[in-house]
Regions:
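Residues that define the loop-to-transmembrane-helix transition and helix capping
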Residues: 39, 67, 93-96, 163, ...
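Glycine/small-residue-rich loop that forms an oxyanion/phosphate-binding "nest" at active or ligand-binding sites
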Residues: 64-110
């Protein structure tokens, strides 16, 4: 039963990634934490995200300046390593509370944010200070609580259209996922069971990416955000209550 649920989680997560370029970790951690140790879901999400990102590199390769996305990606790696190291020292009960609170904020953001229209504005050619800062913070959040999309999408969607935003997210998530996985392995969190789960997710991952990419130009991203937001509200409340009950014992 556990492996069937993992396949379904993988399909949903990578369908969302195929459409938006992000959301994979959020879905895997949100749904996976219902039947897997919450910490291990973040390790699993980082591992499978390496393959998910690589599978999308050649999908809709709109041009983005290397001087723009590479510095952001490198600082995401730095933040990811710091976040993954922090994950190893935070007690599990506190982690559940932190994760639940973060999900609740993320859910509200997904529900109420309205994307702006960018028209034909050209993308930047060089990363600015704010771009680098947001990349670092997002990397830390991804390594620590498994959520890095909200700060990235909130910031970069102000001046990147749908296609270029998806492209940026695909490119910068791959090195960050590799760094997180390597750090988890060094800290002893990446074990044999996580590897088995990740490899088992691969077939559903490819199907999800394929389906998501096919619907990229035909489905509303705002509907996805609202649906995911409602789901995350339920999961976040459950995690917060579970963390509180664990502290009370």
């Amino acid at each position: 039963m556990e492996y069937l649920l993992i396949l379904l989680v993988s399909l949903v997560a990578f369908f969302l990634k195929g459409v938006t370029g992000t959301g994979t970790t959020t879905v895997i951690v949100a749904l996976g934490s219902l039947f897997i140790d919450p910490k291990l879901t973040i390790v699993l999400a980082s591992f499978i995200n390496i393959f998910g990102g690589l599978s999308m590199v050649r999908i809709d390769p709109v041009p983005l300046s290397v001087r723009y996305w590479l510095p952001i990606s490198l600082l995401m790696v730095v933040g990811s390593v710091a976040g993954a190291m922090a994950l190893n020292v935070v007690p599990n009960q506190q982690f559940q509370l932190i994760l639940g609170g973060a999900f609740l904020l993320t859910a509200l953001w997904f529900l109420f944010r309205v994307p702006s229209s960018l028209g034909t504005r050209k993308p930047p050619t060089v990363a600015g200070v704010m771009d680098l800062g947001v990349g670092t913070v997002a990397g830390f959040c991804g390594g620590f609580i498994g959520i890095n999309a909200p700060p990235l999408v909130l910031h970069f969607s102000r001046y990147l259209d749908k296609r270029r935003l998806r492209r940026l997210l695909i490119l910068i998530f791959i090195p960050a996922a590799m760094a997180q996985t390597a750090t988890f392995a060094a800290n002893g969190l990446f074990d044999h069971q996580v590897m088995i789960w990740g490899l088992f997710m691969l077939p559903a991952m490819f199907v999800g990416v394929w389906l998501g990419n096919r619907t990229f130009h035909h489905i509303s991203e705002s509907m996805f955000r609202r649906t995911l937001g409602l789901l995350l509200i339920f999961v976040s409340i459950r995690l917060v209550l579970k963390g509180i009950s664990s502290l009370a014992i």
